[in-house]
Amino acid sequence: YLNAEEWIGEPNWKGVVEQCDEIMKLEYIIEPNWKTNFEVHNEVSREIILPICYKASDEWGNSIHLWTLHYLDPDVLGFTGGMWNGINAQPDFVRTFDTEDPRYEGSFLIGPMIDPSTGEILKTTLGHDLIHTIDLNVVAGTEKTDADGNLTPWGEVHQEDGARINKWVYEKGMQNTNMENDIAIFRLADVYLMKAEALVRMGGDLGEATRLVNAIRERAYGNSDHNYTSVTLDEDRKSTRLN
C-alpha cells in the first residue's frame, strides 16, 4: 500500500491508513523506553512486530560489534573479542540527529574512549588518542585517483575516525561470541509513522498525523518540549530515519 504508486501507478494512502489501523488494534504497544527495542534480550519488547532472531551461539549471527567497533572499544564496553574496525556512520546522517535527543548518543559511539582501569584515553597502535569523531578526514597524500588520473575525495583515514554503531546494546562479558540482540524489521513505531505519512500525503487528518509523530518524539525526549505543532511530510520522514 505504501508503495502502491510506484508499483501500480496510483497511490493508495487510504489503504495504508486502514492497514495501519488494523495493526494498531493488536496487542503491540509503543515501549516507554526506546532502548528496550535494542537491548541484549529485546525479545521482551512489546513494540517489535517482525524481528530477525539471534543467539550468541549462532554460527552466523548478529555480528554488528565486529563490523563497527575499533579493536580497543571492547576494553571500554566490557567484553572481549577481535573487532574489525570497519563500518562507520555517514557524517551527514549523524548530523540529522538533535544532540539533545537521547537517540543521538543511543545510536552512535562518539568521543573519547576511556580506559576504565586508568581513567585515561586509550591510545591506538599509532599512538593517537582513541577518539571517535563524526567526520572521517582523509590523510594528506593518500588521496586516490580515478580512471582518468584525477584526484578523488577517497583515501586513507585514521583508524579512530568515524562514529560507530551504538544502537544495539553490547552485552558486558561477551567472549568472542555473536550478539544476542534481535534486529527488528518492523516495530509499532514504524506503523505510527507510516500512518502519519499517509495522512499527510492524502491531505487527511493532520491532527492525527501530528499526534502519531509526537508520540514517538515524546517517547524519545521524555517530554513534550520538542513536539510539532502540525507535522509536515519532511518531519515525518525525518522521524522515520531517527526511529
Predicted regions and their residues:
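Extracytoplasmic/secreted envelope proteins and their assembly/folding machinery
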Residues: 17-20, 210-213, 233
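C-terminal substrate/ligand-recognition segments
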Residues: 110-216
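An aromatic- and glycine-enriched ligand-binding surface/loop that stacks and positions planar moieties
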Residues: 1-143
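Short edge-strand/loop segments of extracellular domains
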Residues: 22-24, 211-222
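Conserved small/polar residues in nucleotide/adenosyl-binding loops
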Residues: 238-243
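Extracytoplasmic/secretory soluble proteins
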Residues: 222, 231-232
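Glycine- and aromatic-rich loop/turn segments at beta-sheet edges
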Residues: 28-36, 166, 170-172, 224-227
